[in-house]
Structures are given as structure tokens and as C-alpha cells.
């Protein structure tokens, strides 16, 4: 090869970013030389192209009346029931389809609530994917799944969109049982590259030739599993496509995203088209093959050819992905149908070996000005007025348990400088954005990285700080080994605040906090508690602050408090460890509730009192350690003891019966019954519908009590 034989335009490849002079060329040194023919057009980037294009899209939507309450006209979308109906459309028609699809998403979500911003950001990408690929033969995986609404509309579910996230309606995420076009169920983040790689390897082992596409982004690239999967994908070298949906919620240190040049527009289009050039890709494949088949000096030369090809093809920001073994293309304008179709078609048709990553830059909330200006507030929405963007939030006399937790933690931090808070990209969801505003240097957002969050908290505890790790109950599952090995085994005083405990309504089984009591209370050193109301939540935050010799956790539900008086100054009072309380004295039947289930027990007591049965209601407060004296007293003074919890088998009730059995309290006439969530997943729906399906309504508790004492119960239902 000749040294310095070819000069590349600097807008294609420069060290550290894109050149501001698009016509200036830069020569490769002798150590980075490769002879080939490449076009070198002199393109002038338009710094306003992105904003101009966005304005046109917004204007077209407004002109069609899509911001009003009535369903907007969608003549082209009305002809599309499944992806097969898109195949004969022109690119111009695909643009019209995208506009109409975006309008339909806005209209439908305004009526049901749901994840709006993420879905609006991938409209063009969704259209292009279904235009080029053929699901369900080809597999398209949507990471997290909250951006899947356009996908659902195009795959036969448009007529069911008014049922989104409602009882017996469509799931808010992809779900295998809902459609053959949903090849993998999601809800938690950063899983699709792993699953997609498994599908690709399975395809290869079975001799098939379908495509596998994993769409990931919207924060999911902050989780370690995504990089573990890419590392394995690069090693296995199986054909698959990873689409990085970069909507600025992804930790990607790409200079062009923050530099003076816009990351989208004519410049990136030319770069992306060049990078998908089959000749260059085949060059890399030849080099890759040489490195695997030859040794000695020729092996070293072939390795350099591969390295140079990667460098010239990839462009700025690709180093990480290329080092992991993924062929990088991008960045690509995720709202430019022409480019998306061209690149996806090229990638699909080019015979290659190994995984490809296409870096697509999108805008969250695209095409709806209210969502564009406040993508945080329009990530997940309740019902809203499309014309004004105003969300119809229910006016409640009480605040959410999430807010009460945050206020309690702020109150503790005001008087204790060692209190710190950690969350995994969920400042709003956990309430810690309130803590962040008050104590910006004592609140840590670690990204969607629950494993790191737990061990990071363990390290903070080692230094004498008092870390509160606020993670949804269902997301705590992702970091269980860290809870066991890094925290509990070492008796480090990390405090786990587990929001969304129990049934969670519209978010369904992926977010249901069913298992935390079971997997936390089995740990030898963990203190496990749950408040029955918002006042006790304040007290348990104070209790957790005071526990400095071992880890602790407390769970609390989604939804609002019941309206009890709060502690003065929002400052809770520590509870004696392992001490429950009697809320109502009665006879014959004792209802022992744990956490939010205590309120259902009180409701059942009212029903039973109307039928002449005065029962005892107790609030356990602690699952570990149990209030053994309280349980022993209830068991000895009542005919029936019913434990009630909004959790799975193996939780609070199991700990109670273990004690009852070992203490000999089951050897007499006592009748004990546990009431727990059924041993199956409960689908999304209204909270009351979910409780009814679970058999944990006050009427179910009352009926169980009546049945155990031999009284009729039919009138309860």
C-alpha cells in the first residue's frame, strides 16, 4: 500500500470531532494509510436545518388540527392495518404516514395517559423499520417498551389503543402474549441487546436467515447489561443490528452532540451514507477474516487493515462500540425518513458478519411542542388536552407516598449532614428531585444502574455516611446480589426505600412490587418494615436514620396517603425495632396486616362489625424482626388469626407461621390463614380491579373471617 495516498475530507474523519471547515481535507499519515476511492463532496452544514425541519413538522400538525380533542384525519394511516400494507408506499408517502402516526399517538395518549415523549421521538424510526424489515419473521425488540406505541398502531392494534394500560386492555409495553409482532416482553431497561443476541445465535444454530434488530436508548444505555451484551455480541460475531436511539438521555460521550455543529442534517446524512457504503464494509470484513485465518507478520498487517478500516468508516464517537466489536454507523438523523430508509436498506442487504450499531439521534416529544419544551413532564402523562397540553391531574387532599417519603428524608437531612440519597435515574419517580433541590451535593443519580447504586451506597456507608437508596421494589430485583453480598453480608447500614410496593395499576406486572418482602426478609442482617399510612412512613424514615449497625428497608405503595395527621415539622419519631401495634380491639378473629394491607383490614373490620362480629386489627409494622409478643398474644386470645399482605407467597405470612409453628401455637385450636397475592402475575388495570382479582379487597378479608368461624358470607359479594 502507498503511504499518504489518499486524503479524506475533514468533515468525514477528524480526531476529536467534526471539522468546522467542511471543504478542507486532511491527509492520513503513513501509519493510517489505505488506498481506495471515496467521494469527497464539499457540503456546507446548515446550522438551522434541525430547527427548521422541526418547525415545519409542528406547523403541519397544527394545520391539520391534530392538537384538538377530536380525532385528526389520517387517510393514509387508515389504510395500514399491518406492516405488509406499508411495503408499496413511496418515501414521500412514508413521510405523510409518519405525520399521521404522530397525530394518532398524541390523540390516543391524550385519552388514556401513558408514555408520550418517547413514542413521539421514534415515529419515523418505527415507520422505517417496519418498511424495511418484515415482522414477525424479522425480530424487532423495543428496549423498556415505553416507546412502542407507534409500533403497536402499525401492527394491528390501532383499534385497541383506547384501552391502553386499562383493565383487559393493551399493555403499555411490548408483550409477547399480545401480538406476534412483540417478539420480546419489556418494561425494565437494557435487556434487548442480550435478548436479541440470543435470538440471533438461536437463528444461526437453526439455520435461519431472518434479521434481528434491538432498539435501545432513552436512558437504557446507562445500564451495565447493555455493555455486557455488546461485549458478548462482538465476541460471538453473530449478525444483528443494534439501533441506539439517542435522545440525549443516553450517556454517550460523542463530541458532535455537544459541539457547534448540529448532530443531524446534511452533514450527518452524508457521513452516514458514506459509512454504510458496502465497499468499505466489505473491506473491513476481508480484514477481519484475514486476522482470523493467518498468523505472523501477515496477521499483524491484516489487523492494521482492520483497524484502519474501522477508523475511516466509523467517524467521531464510535470508539467504544468499535472496541466492543460492533460496526458503527452514525450519527443519523432519526427524523429523516430518506436517510433512515436508505441506511436500513443498505445494512439489511449487505452481506456481513457480526453486529452493527446504528446511532440514531432523535428528539423526545418530537412534533408536539409541549412535549418538546418539557420532555421530563411529558415522558409519562395522565390524560391531557391536546390543544393546550394541560394534563388533567386529579386533585387530591393528600400527597403521594413518594412525596411524603421525600419530605421525610429532607427533614432528616436538615438536622443530620450525613444523610445522603441515591437513585437510579428516577429522581421524579422516587421523589428525590425534591431532595436534590435542597441538597444538590448530597443526592446522587447514578443512571439506570441499580447494581452500582447499591454497592455505591455500601461504599458511602463504609465512610460513615447514612445512605438512603431509593429504588422501586421491582427494580430492586436487578441488584439483589449486591444487596446480599455487598450490604447485608457486611452488615453495612444502607437504607433501602422501596417505592411502588405491591400492585401498581396501569404499569402492570413488570412494575409490580410483589417480591421484595420475600427476598429482603430472608437476609440474616436486614431489618424489614412497612408503614400502614403516611404518618408511619415519616416515622420509619426516622427509624432508618437511627439504625447504624445493619441494613434496613421499608416498602410503601404507589398512590396517595389516607389523610392522617403528619408529625410536627415533618420530623418522624423512631419506632422501637420489631414493635407492632393494636389498632382495634376485638374478639374471636384477629386481622394482622402488614403495610398498606392494614387499611384493607380496617375496611374489613367495618364490614364485619355491621354483621355483629367485632374483630381485632393489628399493624405488624415489622416483618423482621417480628413482634413475637404481639403475635403470641393474638394467637392465644383469638380463635382465628389472618395475616394480610400485598406481596407474594413466602413473605410476611410465612415468617409469622414459622414463628407460630416453632412456638407451638399451631398445636391447639387456632386457625391461621394467610392472604397474599396469588401465585401468578396480575395484568395492568385499575388498582381496585387488581385488588379484586388478587382477592385482597376488604370484602375478601371479611369473607375469609366469616368462613373460618362458620358464618354465612354470601352477602359480602
Curated annotation (Swiss-Prot):
Organism from which the protein derives = Arabidopsis thaliana
Q: Name one GO molecular function term.
A: metal ion binding
Task: Supply one GO BP term.
Answer: isopentenyl diphosphate biosynthetic process, methylerythritol 4-phosphate pathway
Q: Give the main EC class.
A: transferase
Write out the entry's keywords from A to Z.
Chloroplast, Isoprene biosynthesis, Magnesium, Metal-binding, Plastid, Thiamine biosynthesis, Thiamine pyrophosphate, Transferase, Transit peptide
Q: What Pfam families does the database record attribute to this sequence?
A: DXP_synthase_N, Transket_pyr, Transketolase_C
Q: Which cofactor does it need?
A: Mg(2+); thiamine diphosphate
Q: What is this protein called?
A: 1-deoxy-D-xylulose-5-phosphate synthase, chloroplastic
Please give the family membership noted in the entry: Belongs to the transketolase family. DXPS subfamily.
Binding of thiamine diphosphate: at which residues?
146, 187-189, 219-220, 247, 368, 450
Transit peptide limits: 1-58
Q: What are the EC numbers?
A: 2.2.1.7
Subunit info? Homodimer.
Give the location in the cell.
Plastid, Chloroplast stroma
Further information in the entry reads: Plants over-expressing CLA1 show increased levels of plastid isoprenoids derived from the methylerythritol 4-phosphate (MEP) pathway, such as chlorophylls, tocopherols, carotenoids, abscisic acid, and gibberellin. Mutant plants treated with exogenous mevalonic acid partially recover chlorophyll accumulation and plastid development.
UniProt remark on cofactor binding: Binds 1 Mg(2+) ion per subunit. Binds 1 thiamine pyrophosphate per subunit.
Query: Which reaction is recorded as catalysed by this protein?
Result: D-glyceraldehyde 3-phosphate + pyruvate + H(+) = 1-deoxy-D-xylulose 5-phosphate + CO2
Q: Which PANTHER family match?
A: 1-D-DEOXYXYLULOSE 5-PHOSPHATE SYNTHASE-RELATED (PTHR43322), 1-DEOXY-D-XYLULOSE-5-PHOSPHATE SYNTHASE, CHLOROPLASTIC (PTHR43322:SF5)
Pathway, per record:
Metabolic intermediate biosynthesis; 1-deoxy-D-xylulose 5-phosphate biosynthesis; 1-deoxy-D-xylulose 5-phosphate from D-glyceraldehyde 3-phosphate and pyruvate: step 1/1
Q: Which GO terms describe its cellular component?
A: chloroplast; chloroplast stroma
Q: In which tissues is it expressed?
A: Widely expressed.
Q: Describe the inactivation phenotype.
A: Albino phenotype and seedling lethal when homozygous. The phenotype is caused by an early arrest in chloroplast differentiation.
Induction section of the entry: Circadian-regulated with a peak in the late period of dark phase and early period of the light phase.
Amino acid at each position: 500500500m502507498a503511504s499518504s495516498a489518499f486524503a479524506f475530507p475533514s468533515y468525514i474523519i477528524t480526531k476529536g470531532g467534526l471539522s468546522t471547515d467542511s471543504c478542507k481535507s486532511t491527509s492520513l499519515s503513513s501509519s493510517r494509510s489505505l488506498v481506495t476511492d471515496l467521494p469527497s463532496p464539499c457540503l456546507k452544514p446548515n446550522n438551522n436545518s434541525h430547527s427548521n425541519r422541526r418547525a415545519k413538522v409542528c406547523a403541519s400538525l397544527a394545520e391539520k388540527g391534530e392538537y384538538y380533542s377530536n380525532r385528526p384525519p389520517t387517510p393514509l394511516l387508515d389504510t395500514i392495518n399491518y406492516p405488509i400494507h406499508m411495503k408499496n408506499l413511496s418515501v414521500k408517502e412514508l413521510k405523510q404516514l409518519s405525520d399521521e402516526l404522530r397525530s394518532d399517538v398524541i390523540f390516543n395518549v391524550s385519552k388514556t395517559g401513558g408514555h408520550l415523549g418517547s413514542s413521539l421521538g421514534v415515529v419515523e424510526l418505527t415507520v422505517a423499520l417496519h418498511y424495511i424489515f418484515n415482522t414477525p419473521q424479522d425480530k424487532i425488540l423495543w428496549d423498556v417498551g415505553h416507546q412502542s406505541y407507534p409500533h403497536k398502531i402499525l401492527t394491528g392494534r390501532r383499534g385497541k389503543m383506547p384501552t391502553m394500560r386499562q383493565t383487559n386492555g393493551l399493555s403499555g409495553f411490548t408483550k409477547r402474549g399480545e401480538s406476534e409482532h412483540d417478539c420480546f416482553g419489556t418494561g425494565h431497561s437494557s435487556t434487548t441487546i442480550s435478548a436479541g443476541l440470543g435470538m440471533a445465535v438461536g437463528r444461526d444454530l437453526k439455520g435461519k436467515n431472518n434479521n434481528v434488530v434491538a432498539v435501545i436508548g432513552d436512558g437504557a444505555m446507562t445500564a451495565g447489561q447493555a455493555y455486557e451484551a455488546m461485549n458478548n455480541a462482538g465476541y460471538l460475531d453473530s449478525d444483528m443490528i443494534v439501533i441506539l436511539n439517542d435522545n440525549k438521555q443516553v450517556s454517550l460521550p460523542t463530541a458532535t452532540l455537544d459541539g457547534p455543529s448540529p448532530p443531524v442534517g446534511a452533514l450527518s446524512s452524508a457521513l452516514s451514507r458514506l459509512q454504510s457504503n458496502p465497499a468499505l464494509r466489505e473491506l473491513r470484513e476481508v480484514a477481519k477474516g484475514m486476522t482470523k485465518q493467518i498468523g505472523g507478520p501477515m496477521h499483524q498487517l491484516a489487523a492494521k487493515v482492520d483497524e484502519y478500516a474501522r477508523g475511516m468508516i466509523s467517524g467521531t464517537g464510535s470508539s467504544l462500540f468499535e472496541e466492543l466489536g460492533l460496526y458503527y454507523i452514525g450519527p443519523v438523523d432519526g427524523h429523516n425518513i430518506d436517510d433512515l430508509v436508505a441506511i436500513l436498506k443498505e445494512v439489511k442487504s449487505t452481506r456481513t458478519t457480526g453486529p452493527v450499531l446504528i446511532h440514531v439521534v432523535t428528539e423526545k416529544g418530537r412534533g408536539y411542542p409541549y412535549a418538546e419544551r418539557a420532555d421530563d413532564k411529558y415522558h409519562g402523562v395522565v390524560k391531557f388536552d391536546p390543544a393546550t397540553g394541560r394534563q388533567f391531574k386529579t386533585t387530591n387532599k393528600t400527597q403521594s407516598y413518594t412525596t411524603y417519603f421525600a419530605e421525610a428524608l429532607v427533614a432528616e437531612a436538615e438536622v443530620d449532614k450525613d444523610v445522603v440519597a441515591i437513585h437510579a435515574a428516577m429522581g421524579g419517580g422516587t421523589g428525590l428531585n425534591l431532595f436534590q433541590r435542597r441538597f444538590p451535593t448530597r443526592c446522587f443519580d447514578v443512571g439506570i444502574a441499580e447494581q452500582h447504586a447499591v454497592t455505591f451506597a455500601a461504599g458511602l456507608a463504609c465512610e460513615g455516611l447514612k445512605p438512603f437508596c431509593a429504588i422501586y421494589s421491582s427494580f430492586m430485583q436487578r441488584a439483589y446480589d449486591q444487596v446480599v453480598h455487598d450490604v447485608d453480608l457486611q452488615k453495612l447500614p444502607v437504607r433501602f426505600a422501596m417505592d411502588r410496593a405491591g400492585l401498581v395499576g396501569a404499569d402492570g406486572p413488570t412494575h409490580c412490587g410483589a417480591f421484595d418482602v420475600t427476598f429482603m426478609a430472608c437476609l440474616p442482617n436486614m431489618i424489614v418494615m412497612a408503614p400502614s399510612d403516611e404518618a408511619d412512613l415519616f416515622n420509619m424514615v426516622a427509624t432508618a436514620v437511627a439504625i447504624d449497625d445493619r441494613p434496613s428497608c421499608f416498602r410503601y405503595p404507589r398512590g396517595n396517603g389516607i389523610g392522617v395527621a403528619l408529625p410536627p415539622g415533618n420530623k418522624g419519631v423512631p419506632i422501637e425495632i420489631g414493635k407492632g401495634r393494636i389498632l382495634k380491639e376485638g374478639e374471636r378473629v384477629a386481622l394482622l396486616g402488614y403495610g398498606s394491607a392494614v387499611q384493607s383490614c380496617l375496611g374489613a373490620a367495618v364490614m364485619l362489625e355491621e354483621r355483629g362480629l367485632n374483630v381485632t386489627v393489628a399493624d405488624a409494622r415489622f416483618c423482621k424482626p417480628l413482634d413475637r409478643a404481639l403475635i403470641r398474644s393474638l394467637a392465644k386470645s383469638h380463635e382465628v388469626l389472618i395475616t394480610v399482605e400485598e406481596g407474594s407467597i413466602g413473605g410476611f405470612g410465612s415468617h409469622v407461621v414459622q414463628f407460630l409453628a416453632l412456638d407451638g401455637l399451631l398445636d391447639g385450636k387456632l386457625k391461621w390463614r394467610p392472604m397474599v397475592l396469588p401465585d401468578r402475575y396480575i395484568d395492568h388495570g385499575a388498582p381496585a380491579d387488581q385488588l379484586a382479582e388478587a382477592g385482597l379487597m376488604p370484602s375478601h378479608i371479611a369473607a375469609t373471617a366469616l368462613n373460618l368461624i362458620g358464618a354465612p358470607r354470601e352477602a359480602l359479594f
